Amino acid sequence: MRCLALDIGGTKIAAAIVKNGEIEQRQQIHTPRENVVEGMHQALGKLLADYEGQFDYVAVASTGIINNGILSALNPKNLGGLAEFPLKASIAKHTDKPIGLLNDAQAATYAEYQLQNSEQVSNFVFITVSTGVGGGIVLNQILQTGSRGIAGHIGHTLADPNGAICGCGRRGCVEAIASGRAIEAVSSQWEEPCDPKEVFERFRKNDEKATALVERSAKAIANLIADLVISLDIQKIAIGGSVGLAEGYLPLVEKYLQDFPSIYCCEIESAKFGQDAGLIGAAYWVKDVLLDKPEGTIYG
């Protein structure tokens, strides 16, 4: 079956035909930043028109929360201020094919889990450390989406009760300490301001302030991993995202994990899928979990 896969992020919308895990005819456009509701309707309509007649079903991975076909966000800033959007209904205006929706980090998790030996790893987590911090959870070989679509929003667990206010409105979330946005909130105030990419360049040159900032992020992720392992008996974790895959970051996380008792630790690896993880994961998940159900139920 041929899938039209869409990956809606805070800055871009990617689209492609996915067949047997292979990407074809990939394109990417900017996520609307002005008149975002109407802009999103128009963007989706154009993408559906571009691929008309070339797909058997639609799979969407999107930043934010997917619940009953509605897209919303814990942190609306991640979607250009878009607080709520009828995502499934918008797509359904342009196609009568089946539609399935899920969170982008959940989709990436499903893609990464396809690379695991499910008989050896039944409890798995993917963590993305990028502009924000997100993730997905597989328990007993099943991707957890939750009754409200919020399962896996691990970036909004507590890291520091006295920390900065997160974009979700809570104080001290992991995202408010470990993310690229959190790193930039500090580095932009330095005497010589810089973005997260330059922070890591300075970190690799042993700059004191940059090292402290990267270490703060890595410690928060190490503690998050320990919490996940001890609460859910996680066997393996993959870390991705622009921060998570930055040179020198994963070894720091592993270093801080070694300070904990061994029961809090598990195997950690770098995520294998790159920018197309959401597209591939969504295509696989919709086919495996929704289309292949005997009753054929499609939901999002």
Swiss-Prot record:
It is an enzyme of class 2 (transferase). ATP binds at residues 5-12, 132-139. GO terms for molecular function: ATP binding; N-acylmannosamine kinase activity; zinc ion binding. Zn(2+) binds at H156, C166, C168, C173. Its EC number is 2.7.1.60. GO terms for biological process: N-acetylneuraminate catabolic process. Pathway: Amino-sugar metabolism; N-acetylneuraminate degradation; D-fructose 6-phosphate from N-acetylneuraminate: step 2/5. It comes from the Bacteria. Belongs to the ROK (NagC/XylR) family. NanK subfamily. This is N-acetylmannosamine kinase. It comes from Haemophilus influenzae (strain PittGG).
